[in-house]
Amino acid sequence: RPPRSKLFPYTTLFRSGAKTLDDNFPDVPNPIRHPTPRLRAQLIGLGLLRDTEDESFLANSAAARDQIWTAAAVHLIQTRRPSLLLLHLLITDTVQHRHGPQTLAAYTALALADAHVDDIVRAVEAAGLRERTTIVVASDHGFVRPHKLVNPNVVFRKAGLQRPGPRRRAQAMSHGGTAFVYLTAPETREADRARVIELLREHEGIADILEPDKFAALHLPEPEHNPQMGDLLLVAKEGYAFSNESFEDDSLTEITFPVGSHGYLATNPNMNGVFVAWGRGIKPGPKLGVVEIIDVAPTIAGLLGQKLPHADGRIIRALLKEPLPR
């Protein structure tokens, strides 16, 4: 199957009438180094960016960065009238990680993100593009508030599976509600696998330990096909999350302040996100139930009159007016 970078090929957009993909202001560790030079110069001229230094932009709060990205999107709508515009807002994720979901801070962050969406809608209307525009608002996950952290690496260290130096025979990498365990010594991998399962099977806070034969059902690759995939997948119980800590005394840590976490299995209803679609090609008021995130990109491609033949997802036809654009 093709890599992810090929699933939404540039030709899909060009066939739909896009003239360029050169306007880019990415969310990357060095964000000011990578935008299109023309766009970066214009944003500096508008006072949205101070200079060409990453440090100046990164000194802004998460809320201020979202404001800058939204203003850049409004500028592009006004001056470029793009065929496709993608905007990533960070404030809801940042705040809920720090303060937990369903808190005053979380609701304030949601209100701010909603205001930015309103800015986009108003820019579309001011540009005279309302009848030609579809707006999709989607989030990639929900949030839960854990009360304890499980530290698998502490267990591994105490069992002799982690020793000083670069070679650690077992290393857990947390994704919040799940964690990958990498078994890094080929000569002892199967013995280490059995040992890890034995050590963690009855550990507080761990709901399940999944081996590669269970990965496909979760849309995960097997380690032999993708070296970035772990050899085992740990699943946290309700109220727990994983950490990467290796040097704590205890393998369980009490959380004494509100925080938020995600990365739990998609079967956890708290992981459900948001999906809203409005505008050109969208039926008013359909009852969709739970929408799969893998269906979002094929649906957007369908609105552009294109197909993504290698994508795992499908077009959400109950959402769209027929016939689809060509």
Q: What are the language-model segments listed below?
A:
Residues A111-F156, I300:
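Metal-dependent active-site segment of extracytoplasmic phospho-/sulfohydrolases and closely related
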Residues R1-L13:
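Short, small-residue-biased leader/transition segments that mark boundaries at the very start
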